[in-house]
């Protein structure tokens, strides 16, 4: 017994390993039909069987680990074919990461073919099956337990969890796990793949996870590969996109700039407040010190505190003139004589002057027949040579212009959500109001009705089919419609499709929707429905483009549906463009009139903004006409000086006022005509702004000229022409000063690269110059004729009628306004106690404006361009409220890159083996920082999808063996073979000739159920193949910006995209190359101006001020200090304009910049006349000279430019257009009020303090000029 015991124990030890590791199967071959085309496996408990040789290729392809010895397996060739077919979906999504796919294949190869199945597979249910061919009874395996090691399951999940699905910009597991990728883990992923309710598994397989033997079973716990490990010597680890371990730590955006604060308060406020307080202390300290000094040493308390002792031309202190004084006096004398002689000539020969003036007007205005009006927004807002324009031109010529867009945003009026209960188990899923089946049917009816809209153009019918974007045409002529209904193939029957029985609904539109939002490119929804998600047009419909109002990525919570009809745009083809516009017009009319109580619709067509702008302009035309009519009426009445009712029609100057207005309008017409002759296009902003500007300048000059004459007395022996010549000699230098300085400033403003400012400056400069020339010629002649009419007592307007003689005649007189300025306003303003208050208030306002200077917003809210009652306003509001994706952005690689070399491919691709700083990888990284970069999604990459498409493991790339022509994956033909062999070399990326040989096939391949990677729909326009097929030209990689609402968002998005592209160009080493990478989005051409608008503003206003300074210092006779004071005052007006812009919510853009340039010119009118009058005054003190200048010129400036413009501006407040209310009413009102207050209040006070000393040479010249006349006594008081 003792000998037999050890022998028996030894036998047990020898038998145990054989029992544990023996090779035994649980099935072999396929038997009965499970469901649809899916079959059960046949129960088999014997040893593995040798695989027939015709299956060797398959086992090498799918399960190379089993290809050894006599290849004895537990599966036959048909099971391998079934395995390959069933793995096509995971192959398309997970093969990007070889380690992930290797582990997955391990799981399924062990399940299907492992020669040791019985160790970890336990059959739990079978049924008999009679083979109809052999009539043999076999046993189907209906249910199975699969024992899987937890270590293996977790390692497989970890290797796959980061893998991207580029076509949907989702994690691939979100498409393969039956739930969101975030909720997916190792166990529920494997459970879902083995659940027959997923539509793919033929029967139920229950996975049991354990690392220890359980119930006598040894779990399958094969070795795995991490995503950062290579599967073999040839294949590298997964890319950074698909494996976060490879990437290292997630990049962090730079911290936002720290606000500039002092003591916790805004630094600008603190600095300007402190500066203002310091100024007040110094200023009032000096004021009271001088006041005390004067009280102590001077008897009279009314002696001016500026210390400028009265100087008279008759005083004994003649003194010596400064070196520049005689030069200035000589220049002034020369201008007086020149204009006096010219004025006398015009009065003596009115017919000749008026005739030649009319001839000049007609000749110049005739150029209007060649006028070209620029209405294209691109030309209006973007300079032809700008970076955005060059990039747009490159994109349009290589890929075609960006499509036109017709879009609807639809909400359900019933806000009730509903709950979906998944079968057989799972958390309840809420669905938003518009995702109820009934609402979807109604929306589909609307969508179909829009598809059937017809329009007429040139007696031809235009349908959506004629103009729409159909990427697969002519194979598939379906229009691209980005709509959630395309998940249901735009079909009522598919929407109603469901699978169930009397008790339960296993799958319906809810199931399909939840799958499609995760896999929009899928051709089989992997549920019991088996409906495709791919749109009928052959491309994916991304959920973020067709759903709105959801939270995070819970698309089922959507509160709005978005339907977009992309329409072809045309590059330089007006005929086709107008056909599209004709259909859009019918589309707008249809949706406007569409009624459905269950739907609320916001919509816009491509032409909507232009249509609404035209409607807005027409609706505000009446308001504008009233504005100008009020100004014209005021001018006509205010020019006359009525002394008595009996002489009302004699002393009125209605005809002269109308003539002056016509001269102003003629100067505008001449300017337009001259530039039309030379081919400079006109913009709408010129038409809107220049009449206002020229009217301001022209009216001011008219009032100064006429009122100076009215206050003048004809000298003894002086004729009318001599008197008017002398008057013109007095005022024309001032008119010339203001007009010429404005002209030079505007012409220099033409150097601006901002199209609106450039065009405005050219037209404005010419109009102001012509207006001045016509005023000193034609208007002077007409004034002489009107005075002759008045002297002959003839009625105004009807000059052939003579009024009654009253003996009064034409006498010099002072108007009420002049007397008010002279006797009340000027003395009050220049009181000793008033002047410091004025200085303190204006410096305070200036300090405030400087403090908010950097807070003025940049940009232009597009909704401001729309009328308040426009349907587009509702669309803009819905756009910002519901949409979750911004405009598409294309990262363009210009022609020149070598895609056929491995190095060139690694620079751009994002998959296996690609550089960690490749183009696609950098955009992917940017999308992870979407709040900072404003890149919302990973890019669609044609080159990565091409590499997946051409893999020999895939069924996508095949050619006919006999002809070497492309064979689509849907074709069943034994002569179709793989494009590349299933060898180590064949599995590598194609290079050189291979790359170019198969690329056209990829770009022409339409997606189908057997291959969803065909690139025709997605990439046919993204890749330019050179004419001879030798290489790849320009290409693009598309993604989307995040939702952009405010102008600041658009500007920042463009800046960040350019920064990314610049970094890509640098990392690719293309700085010295002939090509580069640049981003393009349709809005860049409109928002690029804002990148430099601050610099443009400084440049334009600086050039204008510089020009005004130079011209003024020359024309004012080298009065340098007076010029400095005038320019400082104008600069204060401009700075205060920014303060008003901040207070009134006016942003800085091309429109407001044009207004600022214009305000610079108009400010000259408010300041130059008074400054020049101050320098010419011969009164003793600065206070007296300021008072005289304000009395004589201030009244004309106030009655001319101020009251004229104020009356016209107030009417603009009633305009319907928001852009008129904000950029014209508000800014024009600010220009006039700030100009008037600075010119008529601040400037005289400033001159009274620090104005230049009297020009002694000019005062002596004045004495000589009036010696012996009645005016001599006026100079000596």
Curated annotation (Swiss-Prot):
Quaternary structure and partners: Interacts (via the second lumenal domain) with NPC2. Interacts with TMEM97; the interaction may decrease NPC1 availability to the cell. Interacts with TIM1. Interacts with SLC38A9; this interaction inhibits cholesterol-mediated mTORC1 activation via its sterol transport activity.
Annotated segments matching region Required for location in lysosomes: 1274-1277
Keyword check for Metal-binding: no
PTM per Swiss-Prot/TrEMBL: N-glycosylated.
One family name in Pfam for this protein: Sterol-sensing
Name this polypeptide is given: NPC intracellular cholesterol transporter 1
Function recorded in the entry: Intracellular cholesterol transporter which acts in concert with NPC2 and plays an important role in the egress of cholesterol from the endosomal/lysosomal compartment. Unesterified cholesterol that has been released from LDLs in the lumen of the late endosomes/lysosomes is transferred by NPC2 to the cholesterol-binding pocket in the N-terminal domain of NPC1. Cholesterol binds to NPC1 with the hydroxyl group buried in the binding pocket. Binds oxysterol with higher affinity than cholesterol.
Compartments in which it is found: Late endosome membrane; Lysosome membrane
Native source organism of the sequence: Sus scrofa
Cytoplasmic side: 291-350, 643-653, 699-734, 781-832, 1119-1123, 1167-1194, 1248-1277
GO CC annotations on file: endoplasmic reticulum; extracellular region; late endosome membrane; lysosomal membrane; lysosome; nuclear envelope; perinuclear region of cytoplasm; plasma membrane
Primary localization class, coarse: membrane
């Amino acid at each position: 017994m003792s000998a037999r015991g050890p022998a028996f124990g030894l036998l047990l030890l020898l038998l145990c390993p054989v029992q544990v590791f023996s090779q035994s199967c649980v099935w072999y071959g396929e038997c009965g039909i499970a469901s649809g085309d899916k079959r059960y496996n046949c129960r088999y408990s014997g040893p593995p069987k040798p695989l027939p040789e015709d299956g060797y290729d398959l086992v090498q392809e799918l399960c190379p680990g089993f290809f050894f010895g006599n290849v004895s397996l537990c599966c036959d060739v048909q099971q391998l074919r079934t395995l390959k077919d069933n793995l096509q979906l995971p192959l398309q999504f997970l093969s990007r990461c070889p380690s992930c796919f290797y582990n997955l294949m391990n799981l399924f190869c062990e399940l299907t073919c492992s020669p040791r199945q019985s160790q970890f597979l336990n059959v739990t249910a079978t049924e008999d099956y009679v083979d109809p061919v052999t009539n043999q009874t076999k046993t189907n395996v209906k249910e199975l337990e699969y024992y899987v090691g937890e270590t293996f399951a977790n390692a497989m999940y970890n290797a796959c969890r980061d893998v991207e699905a580029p076509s949907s910009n989702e994690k691939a597991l979100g498409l393969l796990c039956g739930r969101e990728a975030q909720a997916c883990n190792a166990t529920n992923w494997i459970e879902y793949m083995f659940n027959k309710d997923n539509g793919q598994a033929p029967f139920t397989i229950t996975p049991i996870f354990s690392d220890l033997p359980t119930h006598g079973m040894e779990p399958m716990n094969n070795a795995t590969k991490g995503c950062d490990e290579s599967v073999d010597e040839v294949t590298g680890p997964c890319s950074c996109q698909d494996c976060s371990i490879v990437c290292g730590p997630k990049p962090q955006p730079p911290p936002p700039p720290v606000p500039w604060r002092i003591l916790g308060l805004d630094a600008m406020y603190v600095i300007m407040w402190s500066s203002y307080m310091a100024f007040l202390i110094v200023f009032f300290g000096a004021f009271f010190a001088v006041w005390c000094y004067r009280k102590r040493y001077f008897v009279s308390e009314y002696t001016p505190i500026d210390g400028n002792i009265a100087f008279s031309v008759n005083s004994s202190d003649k003194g010596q003139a400064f070196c520049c004084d005689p030069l200035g006096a000589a220049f002034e004398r020369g201008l007086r004589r020149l204009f006096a002689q010219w004025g006398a000539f015009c009065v003596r020969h009115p017919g000749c002057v008026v005739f030649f003036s009319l001839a000049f007007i007609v000749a110049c205005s005739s150029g209007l027949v060649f006028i070209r009006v620029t209405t294209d927004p691109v030309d209006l807002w973007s300079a032809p040579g700008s970076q955005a324009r060059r990039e747009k031109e490159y994109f349009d010529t290589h890929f075609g212009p960006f499509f036109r867009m017709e879009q609807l945003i639809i909400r359900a009026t019933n806000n009730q959500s509903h709950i979906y209960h998944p079968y057989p188990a799972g958390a309840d899923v809420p669905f938003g109001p518009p995702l109820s089946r009934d609402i979807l049917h109604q929306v589909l009816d609307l969508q179909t009705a829009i598809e059937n809209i017809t329009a007429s153009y040139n007696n031809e019918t235009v349908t959506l089919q004629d103009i729409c974007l159909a990427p697969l045409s002519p194979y598939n002529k379906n229009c691209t419609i980005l709509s959630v209904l395309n998940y249901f193939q735009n079909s009522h029957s598919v929407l109603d499709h469901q699978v169930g029985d009397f008790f339960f609904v296993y799958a319906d539109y809810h199931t399909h929707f939840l799958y499609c939002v995760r896999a929009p490119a899928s051709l089989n929804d992997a549920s019991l429905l088996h409906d495709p998600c791919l749109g009928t047009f052959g491309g994916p419909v991304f959920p973020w483009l067709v759903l709105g109002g959801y939270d995070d990525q819970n698309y089922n919570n959507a509160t709005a549906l978005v339907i977009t009809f992309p329409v072809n745009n045309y590059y330089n083809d007006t005929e086709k463009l107008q056909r599209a516009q004709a259909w859009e017009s019918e589309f707008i009319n249809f949706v406007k009139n569409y009624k459905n109580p269950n739907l609320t619709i916001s919509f816009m067509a491509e032409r909507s903004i232009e249509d609404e702008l035209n409607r807005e302009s027409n609706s505000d035309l009446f308001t504008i006409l009233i504005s100008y009519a009020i100004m014209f009426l005021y001018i006509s009445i205010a020019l006359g000086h009525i002394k008595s009712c009996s002489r009302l029609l004699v002393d009125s100057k209605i005809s002269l006022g109308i003539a002056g207005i016509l001269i102003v309008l003629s100067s505008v017409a001449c300017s337009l005509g001259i530039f039309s002759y030379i081919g400079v296009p006109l913009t709408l902003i010129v038409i809107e702004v220049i009449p206002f500007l020229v009217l301001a300048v022209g009216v001011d000059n008219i009032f100064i000229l006429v009122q100076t004459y009215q206050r003048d007395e004809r000298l003894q022996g002086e004729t009318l022409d001599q008197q008017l010549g002398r008057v013109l000699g007095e005022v024309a230098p001032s008119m010339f000063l203001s007009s010429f300085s404005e002209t030079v400033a505007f012409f220099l403003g033409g150097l601006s690269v901002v199209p609106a400012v450039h065009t405005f400056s050219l037209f404005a400069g010419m109009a102001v110059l012509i207006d001045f020339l016509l005023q000193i010629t034609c208007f002077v002649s007409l004034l002489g004729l009107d005075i002759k009419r008045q002297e002959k007592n003839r009625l105004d307007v009807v000059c052939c009628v003579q009024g009654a003689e009253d003996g009064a005649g034409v006498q010099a007189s002072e108007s009420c306004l002049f007397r008010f300025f002279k006797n009340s306003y000027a003395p009050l303003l220049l009181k000793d106690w008033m002047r410091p208050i004025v200085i303190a208030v204006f410096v305070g306002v200036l300090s405030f404006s400087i403090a908010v200077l950097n807070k003025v917003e940049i940009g232009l809210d597009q909704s401001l361009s729309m009328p308040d009652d426009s349907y587009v306003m509702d669309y803009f509001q819905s756009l910002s409220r519901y949409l979750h994706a911004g405009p598409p952005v294309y990262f363009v690689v210009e022609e020149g890159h070598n895609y056929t070399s491995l190095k060139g491919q690694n620079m751009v691709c994002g998959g296996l083996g690609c550089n960690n700083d490749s183009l696609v990888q950098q955009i992917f990284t940017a999308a992870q920082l979407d709040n900072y970069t404003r890149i919302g999604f990973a890019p669609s990459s044609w080159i990565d999808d091409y590499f997946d498409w051409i893999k020999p493991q895939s069924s996508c790339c095949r050619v006919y063996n006999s002809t070497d022509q492309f064979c689509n994956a849907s074709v069943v033909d034994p002569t179709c073979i793989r494009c590349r062999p299933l060898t180590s070399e064949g599995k590598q990326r194609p290079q050189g000739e291979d790359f170019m040989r198969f690329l056209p096939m990829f770009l022409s391949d339409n997606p189908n159920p057997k291959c969803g990677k065909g690139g025709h729909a997605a990439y046919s326009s993204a890749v330019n193949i050179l004419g001879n097929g030798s290489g790849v030209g320009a290409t693009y990689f598309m993604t989307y910006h995040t939702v952009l609402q405010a102008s600041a968002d658009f500007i920042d998005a463009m800046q960040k995209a350019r920064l990314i592209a610049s970094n890509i160009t640098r990392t690719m080493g293309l700085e010295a190359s002939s090509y580069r990478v640049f981003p393009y989005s349709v809005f860049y051409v409109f928002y690029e101006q804002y990148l430099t608008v601050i610099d443009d503003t400084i440049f334009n206003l600086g050039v204008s001020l510089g020009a005004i300074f130079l011209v003024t210092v020359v024309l004012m006779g080298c009065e340098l200090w007076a010029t400095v004071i005038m320019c400082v005052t104008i600069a204060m007006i401009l700075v205060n304009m920014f303060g008003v812009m901040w207070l009134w919510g006016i942003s800085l853009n091309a429109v407001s910049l044009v207004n600022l340039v214009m305000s610079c010119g108009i400010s000259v009118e408010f300041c130059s006349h008074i400054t020049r009058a101050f320098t010419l005054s011969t009164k003793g003190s600065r206070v007296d000279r300021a008072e005289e200048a304000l009395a004589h010129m201030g009244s004309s400036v106030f009655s001319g430019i101020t009251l004229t413009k104020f009356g016209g501006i107030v009417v603009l407040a009633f305009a319907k257009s928001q852009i008129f209310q904000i950029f014209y009413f508000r800014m024009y009102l600010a220009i006039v009020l700030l100009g008037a207050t600075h010119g008529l209040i601040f400037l005289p006070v400033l001159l009274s303090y620090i104005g230049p000393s009297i020009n002694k040479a000019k005062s002596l010249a004045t004495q000589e000029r009036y010696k012996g006349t009645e005016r001599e006594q006026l100079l000596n008081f």
